[in-house]
Amino acid sequence: MNITILSVGKLKEKYIKQGIDEYKKRLSAYAKIQEIEVPDEKAPEHLSTEDMRLVKKKEGERLLAKISADSYVIALAIEGNMKTSEQLAKNIEQLGTYGKSKIAFIIGGSLGLSNDVYARADELLSFSKMTFPHQLMKLVLFEQLYRSFRIMRGEPYHK
């Protein structure tokens, strides 16, 4: 299985990068993992509604340009469906069973995702109704993917 994690902005926090690197290493035993960061759009601190839409549109175009046409796209969004770790594992396993060997997870920037990204997404996934820094969500996503593969293989994982 090929999994791509696409996100907006460069990861700056060293401790988050270290955590992601650890989970990428662990995940390499189960799947081919690719991490792609697209530049965030520079914007003034106080944005109008139209400015926010334009920023999300530009960031969305950068994200969409990196997704292959045959990828199953899961966008992380507050309004998405929440799943247990077991449900996420089953979902990933079923995608592989039904021939979806390329999965792309998309994490938006600080303003969220554009309507075009939502339109391209095959599924919306939420980890919480709370808002989290997108860089922290990347670490959480990597951990949940690792946990999912351990669950799929019936391997123990510390709870």
Swiss-Prot record:
Which gene produces this protein? rlmH
PANTHER family according to UniProt: METHYLTRANSFERASE (PTHR33603), RIBOSOMAL RNA LARGE SUBUNIT METHYLTRANSFERASE H (PTHR33603:SF1)
**Keyword match Ribosomal protein:** no
Give the location in the cell. Answer: Cytoplasm
Q: What are the UniProt keywords, alphabetically?
A: Cytoplasm, Methyltransferase, rRNA processing, S-adenosyl-L-methionine, Transferase
Q: Which reaction does it catalyse?
A: pseudouridine(1915) in 23S rRNA + S-adenosyl-L-methionine = N(3)-methylpseudouridine(1915) in 23S rRNA + S-adenosyl-L-homocysteine + H(+)
Q: Which GO terms describe its cellular component?
A: cytoplasm
**Oligomeric and partner information:** Homodimer.
Which Gene3D superfamilies does the protein's record reference? Answer: 3.40.1280.10
Family designation: Belongs to the RNA methyltransferase RlmH family.
Supply the source organism for this entry.
Shouchella clausii (strain KSM-K16) (Alkalihalobacillus clausii)
> Which coarse location class describes where this protein primarily resides?
cytoplasm
The name on file for this protein is: Ribosomal RNA large subunit methyltransferase H
Record function comment: Specifically methylates the pseudouridine at position 1915 (m3Psi1915) in 23S rRNA.
What EC class is this?
Answer: transferase
